[in-house]
Amino acid sequence: EQDLDFELGSVLVSNTFGAQLRNNTIDGVGLRSTREREFLADIRFDSVDQSSVSTYWQSEAQWTQSLRSTTSLRYDRFDFDVTSLAAADPTTLAANSGRKNDSVVSGSLGLIYTVDDSLELYANIGQGFHSNDARGVISRLDPVSGEAIDAADPLVKTLGSEIGARLFLTERLNASLVLWQLDIDSELLFVGDAGNTEDTGVGSERHGLELTGYYQIGNSWSVDLEYANANSRFETPIDGFDDIPGALEHVVSGGIGFQRGDGFHGYLRLRHFGDYNLDGGVDAEGSTLLNARLGYAFNDRLSITVDALNMLDSNDRDIQYFYESQLRGEPAPVEDRHFHVFEPRAIRAYLEYTF
């Protein structure tokens, strides 16, 4: 990464140029049939090698004492290499192995205006992307049925925008509000029993708001509260419904924490997910989770921490899907909710020493 600053008339322009390299190699990733945690058979099992190279430029200009702007440009290239090692239908191994690459150029623009010491306004618009599961990018056959499936696009473009305000009400209290929108060129759906992703071929639109508030109580204690709302819809309805499976609509989180000068620190945090769509007219139940931490730093090098996870021992559902499956004794597959509850209440202790 390299910085380069210069003046454009009376305007100071700060530039950053850089490059990134990344490689992920997974010798084995898959979905397997089990009974009471005992392995029965592979549904699919693959080795994945994924690498990326990126170059970027970011520029910030201070136009006036109150107004500044940010501009950025980025290039990304991804290479996917998948070898299918095992599958419920072994004849699909060759078709679900291979290589593919893709690249994308993205740009963004942002404006920030400082009204006074207590209020800052901003607006951003930018292009982006998300990379899809390498297995879904390469696969051409369903590993269970052997039927032909559409491979997913390696990189899917997005366009996002937001306007917001940051409020510094007092030295101890600050808050923020942002309204946002995100358009995605294509949405994927997870097919649980097949262990693959399915390209809907349909784009999506999301918009919502986020509220945050932070308050410092004295010198040791602090309280924070965050709320996020998102309205997510397919651009074109699928099977008569435009709800996106798995897209959360309401998220609330908050906590209270402390950091004392004598080395003690800790927090209590609550997170709540509201009900959300699973498939068409079927909804998933919301969930609430409470965690806590207490720690003590003996010095700059040695500390001990104790975490209490799922303090209320909640049986709320941590993850949920709606798809077709067949249990022993059932004459035919049945569509139903499939879920995993939170891990039971657990206490974990950590001893950390920094060299």
Predicted regions and their residues:
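Face-selective signature of the C-terminal outer-membrane beta-barrel domain
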Residues: 1-87, 112-114, 176, 224
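Gram-negative outer-membrane beta-barrel transporters
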Residues: 2-3, 176-184, 200-280, 354
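Residues on the lipid-exposed face of transmembrane beta-strands in outer-membrane beta-barrel proteins
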Residues: 2-4, 55-61, 101, 109-113, ...
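Repeated loop/turn-to-beta-strand initiation elements of outer-membrane beta-barrel proteins
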Residues: 10-12, 66-69, 118-121, 171-175, ...
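Transmembrane beta-strands of outer-membrane beta-barrel pores
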Residues: 21-27, 75-81, 125-131, 140, ...
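Membrane-embedded beta-barrel scaffold of Gram-negative outer-membrane proteins
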Residues: 23, 27, 114-128, 152-234, ...
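Residues that define the transmembrane beta-barrel architecture of outer-membrane proteins
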Residues: 49-53, 101-105, 157-161, 205-207, ...
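C-terminal beta-signal and adjacent terminal beta-strands/loops
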Residues: 223, 296-355
